[in-house]
Amino acid sequence: MAGSSLTSASTSASKTLESAMGQSLTESANAQASKMKMDTQNSILDGKMDSASKSINSGHNAAKAIQF
């Protein structure tokens, strides 16, 4: 009878840990996916800002080149 109780407790503990590991893995994957999306959006915005900055600098340099 004691062996049966120990087996039952062990099985219950294993199921609890398995469930916790599954939830942890899912949460981790979701967080990584969210970070990947955010990193991509930031990269796109950085590229747009760089292009805008280059355009402004080009216009500024062209204006400086005009001599009266």
Swiss-Prot record:
Polar residues: compositionally biased ranges: 21-44
One annotated Gene Ontology cellular component of this protein: pilus
Subcellular location: Secreted; Fimbrium
Keywords: Fimbrium, Secreted, Virulence
Main subcellular localisation: secreted
Protein family membership: Belongs to the HrpA type 2 family.
Compositional bias per record (Low complexity), positions renumbered to this chain: 1-20
Region Disordered, residue ranges: 1-68
Physiological role: Major structure protein of the hrp pilus, which is a component of the type III secretion system (T3SS, Hrp secretion system) required for effector protein delivery, parasitism, and pathogenicity. The hrp pilus functions as a conduit for protein delivery into the host cell. HrpA is required for the secretion of HrpN and DspA/E.
Lineage: Bacteria, Pseudomonadati, Pseudomonadota, Gammaproteobacteria, Enterobacterales
Protein known as: Hrp pili protein HrpA
